[in-house]
């Protein structure tokens, strides 16, 4: 089971963050067909937005989420961005969370810091434990 799916642009910030995070993850391709997932996952995405907030969600992420199966298995989103862009910092996470009715679990800047990595690891462990407990309760 891959519990993380991510997209990283040519800047590589999200890819560097994911490498340092050290957890199994599926990378979305920039141009090839989108994969289809078969288990619940958390999406990690950068933010691409103009000064007005348009275009915040990268096109490969939109393409991936337009697959109803992929969208149904999404459990949360982690978003990256650049604080220099003010209100649009990590906006992709807010857009996806609202459209897909999932929580924004974390926001990070650029390639993240060591503190971000530690918080994400701990937060994801708690999140998946809670998801597992919820699944067990609904199956009982």
UniProtKB/Swiss-Prot annotation:
GO molecular function, one term: FMN binding
GO biological process: protein modification process
InterPro entries for this protein: Flavoprotein-like_sf, RNR_Ib_NrdI_bac, RNR_NrdI
Pfam families associated with the record: Flavodoxin_NdrI (PF07972)
Domain of life: Bacteria
Gene3D superfamilies given in the database record: 3.40.50.360
Task performed by this protein: Probably involved in ribonucleotide reductase function.
Similarity-based family: Belongs to the NrdI family.
The protein's name: Protein NrdI
Lineage: Bacteria, Pseudomonadati, Pseudomonadota, Alphaproteobacteria, Rhodobacterales
Name of the encoding gene: nrdI
């Amino acid at each position: 089971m891959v519990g993380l799916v991510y997209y990283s642009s040519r800047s590589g910030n999200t890819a560097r963050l994911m490498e340092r995070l050290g957890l199994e993850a599926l990378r979305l391709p920039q141009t090839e067909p989108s994969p289809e997932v078969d288990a619940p996952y958390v999406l990690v995405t950068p933010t691409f937005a103009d000064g007005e907030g348009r275009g915040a969600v990268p096109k490969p992420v939109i393409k991936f989420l337009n697959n109803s199966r992929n969208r149904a298995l999404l459990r949360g989103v982690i978003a990256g961005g650049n604080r220099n862009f003010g209100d649009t910092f990590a906006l992709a996470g807010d857009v996806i969370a609202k459209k897909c009715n999932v929580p924004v679990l974390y926001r990070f800047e650029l390639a993240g810091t060591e503190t971000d990595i530690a918080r994400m690891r701990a937060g994801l462990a708690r999140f998946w434990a809670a998801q597992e407990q919820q699944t067990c309760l609904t199956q009982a």
